[in-house]
Amino acid sequence: VPRGDGRLSHDLDPQRPGPQDACGVFGVWAPGEEVANLTYFGLYALQHRGQEAAGIAVSDGTGVVVYKDLGLVAQVFDEPTLASLRGHVAIGHARYSTTGASTWENAQPTMRSTTSGTTIALAHNGNLVNAAELHRAAGERELMADGATNDTSLVTMLLASRPDLSVEAAALEVLPQLRGAFSFVFMDESTLYAARDPHGVRPLVLGRLERGWVVASETAALDIVGASVVREVEPGELIAIDEDGLRSARFASPEPKGCLFEYVYIARPDATIAGRNVHAARVQIGRQLAREHQVDADLVIPVPESGTPAAIGYAAESGITFGAGLMKNPYVGRTFIQPSQTLRQLGIRLKLNPLRENVRGKRLVVVDDSIVRGNTQRAIVRMLREAGALEVHVRISSPPVAWPCFYGIDFATRAELLANGLDNEGIRRSIGADTLGYVSLSGLIAATEQPKSRLCRACFDGEYPIDLPPDTLIGKHVLEGVGRRVAAESPDLHSAPLVAALSGHDTFSSARAPRPDPEEPTTHRR
């Protein structure tokens, strides 16, 4: 299932994946509608935001069912499964892990039951930077009891640990304690909730159906289910939707710092962020790139697909012909089968192949979205030269990525970032290009039509809008050690009855059933 707007070209190297977003989230409250089907289609539209796992939680008012597994949305769900997920409220999640390993336990939505009998399911796009601090305050054993080691499970537990409060009231207490980037959708038996961190780092939009409401990571997910865009969920806002309508509350003062990299790559080109169409922004970035880095050439080609809009803009501004020079195989890299060493050695040739008749004897401008480690660009330059290109000029539609992201994009470590150790000339020599040009940070910001003060630019300039803890208390696997300690102390932790007792679920919560029984508030996997 290829993503609609292409993968980062760094992912063309199967041994070294490039930046990945944390997740895509979707929620719907719509009595009388097939909410599981709507959620499936919404997740399908958000598949580009996460390909490790997918899940849907649904409720008919009497109980919550969560169905999730590792794999793409279309691999996890089939028609009989969706038909069995009946209700009026649902949330869904497409996962790429930024905290916690890629395991079934860490797939989302996560679920917890309170001692008062309410069940909470939650899905998260983003990354908390104070997860270690929160888990110490909550207690290791309680956090890790269900085998999960991600910050989403931690937040779900915190919400469920206040049985004397309604879910809405508990959220207004818990959300101000969280530091980092988060766009949440969560639910109980009757109500859909959505919340966005005070900086609004990750996107979250509200839509209207004829008979209900939808919340999603991107506007494209609203389009696919026929919902009209109402507005963005505001930074620092909590929304609750039930039979009484929509309620909004502030849990923090807004200090907008939307992710600049969403415009470069993460969001679909048909999405709209802060009123700006992403495709139009990327074309404008390409125009700016041409103004800043002119070159005499015969053909402008994109690295498909994420480099295409910027290449269109570059060609239009420079007057150089736009054309195809690389063909991409969309079916490589979409499987859990590990490639053999022979396939690994083929590397980028598995995914890209030059159009030799188009590039032979030409001076090429190759437009890509970003450079992380440089492996893919190095291979592309070599491949195009072997195909007969006279010159290869690389143009990048973002500034050098020199700093890792701690707010929901799984970049390489700083030591692995090529721009951290080399200047532009060093990078040019490293990848073997005749010339190399990056768009300026000011040029990129101008293309978004957002003021600099409202954007998170940390991966480009190292200015992190949310204070970070010491290195030992942050990172993708910060909670993994806790899980190992708890497992060592409790060798039978993963038996179904014990997991159920510790996590507050009934024994069916841990069942590995082929299909959920909607009569029970349970969590299932395929």
Give the ranges of each region predicted by the language model.
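Phosphate/diphosphate-binding loops
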Residues: 173, 221, 228, 236-237, ...
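Conserved short alpha-helical segments that host acidic/polar catalytic motifs at enzyme active sites
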Residues: 2-235, 240-297, 303, 391
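Generic beta-strand/beta-sheet core signal
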Residues: 123, 187, 195-196, 207, ...
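Secondary-structure transition/capping motifs at alpha-helix termini
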Residues: 144, 164-165, 292-298, 316-323, ...
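A conserved beta-strand->alpha-helix junction
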Residues: 148-149, 153-156, 322-333, 430-448
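Flexible loop/turn segments at secondary-structure boundaries
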Residues: 35, 98-99, 130, 201-202, ...
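PRPP-dependent phosphoribosyltransferase catalytic core
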Residues: 175, 190-191, 226-232, 252, ...
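Short, glycine/charge-rich flexible loops or terminal/linker lids adjacent to PRPP-binding catalytic cores
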Residues: 319-364, 375, 402-412
